[in-house]
């Protein structure tokens, strides 16, 4: 079990998948949201939670005032845990899409998001994550001002952000590195 750190559901526990996931620690999640909320008010934002695992990142965003979160998870067991966590917390604005992150992002959207949270398994190659970041911009997911946060192992190669993103300072917590960037201009 892990818990929601802040907002209306702060302190409430959520389930985590039994195997095969690496939930973001409370310390890293709290730091991530402190970094983002120092620059952005989450109230009313649209959020995309990629490689959602237990849904902890997206649920934290909803608890802190985000209007909507689209959770994307390919593993059926993890997706079932996310669905149970959404129901248990009773937070509105949550949508769960089961499927491979690359396929969902490639399908595109007409509703860009304000915040992208991505916590890919550490064994996902950095080049694959780079491709997802590029596809976010070309498939309508981002707009000027969209912030993206990617959690990686410190042993993983640093990400190569596509043109049009301004990197924020990365943060390291033990074996975890947070890479952050802001979209400078609208999709082309």
UniProtKB/Swiss-Prot annotation:
Residues 25-188 are annotated as: SAM-MT-fold. Residues 17-24 are annotated as: Linker. Belongs to the methyltransferase superfamily. Monomer. Within host cells, interacts with histones H3 and H4. Keywords: Host cytoplasm, Host nucleus, Methyltransferase, rRNA processing, S-adenosyl-L-methionine, Secreted, Transferase, Virulence. Phosphorylation stimulates DNA binding and DNA methyltransferase activity, but does not influence secretion. Exists in a compact, folded state at both pH 7.5 and pH 4.0, the acidic pH that mycobacterial proteins may encounter in the host lysosomal or endosomal compartments. The protein is more compact and stable at pH 4.0 than pH 7.5. It comes from Mycobacterium tuberculosis (strain ATCC 25618 / H37Rv). It catalyses: guanosine(966) in 16S rRNA + S-adenosyl-L-methionine = N(2)-methylguanosine(966) in 16S rRNA + S-adenosyl-L-homocysteine + H(+). Its EC number is 2.1.1.-, 2.1.1.171. One of its GO terms (molecular function) is nucleic acid binding. This is RNA/DNA methyltransferase Rv2966c.
């Amino acid at each position: 079990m892990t818990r929601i750190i802040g907002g209306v559901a702060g302190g409430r526990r959520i389930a985590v998948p039994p195997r095969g996931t690496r939930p973001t620690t409370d310390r890293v999640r709290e730091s991530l949201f402190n970094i983002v909320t120092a620059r952005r008010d989450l109230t009313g934002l649209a959020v995309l939670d990629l490689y959602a695992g237990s849904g902890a990142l997206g649920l934290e965003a909803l608890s802190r005032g985000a209007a909507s979160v689209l959770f994307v998870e390919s593993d059926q067991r993890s997706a079932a845990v996310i669905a149970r966590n959404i129901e248990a917390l009773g937070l509105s604005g949550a949508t769960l899409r089961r499927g491979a992150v690359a396929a969902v992002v490639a399908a595109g959207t007409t509703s860009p998001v304000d915040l992208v949270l991505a916590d890919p398994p550490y064994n996902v190659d950095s080049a694959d994550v780079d491709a997802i970041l590029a596809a976010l911009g070309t498939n309508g997911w981002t707009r000027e001002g969209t912030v993206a946060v990617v959690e990686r192992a410190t042993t993983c190669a640093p990400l190569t952000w596509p043109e049009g993103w301004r990197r924020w300072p990365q943060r390291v917590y033990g074996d975890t590195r947070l890479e952050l960037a802001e979209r400078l201009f609208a999709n082309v």
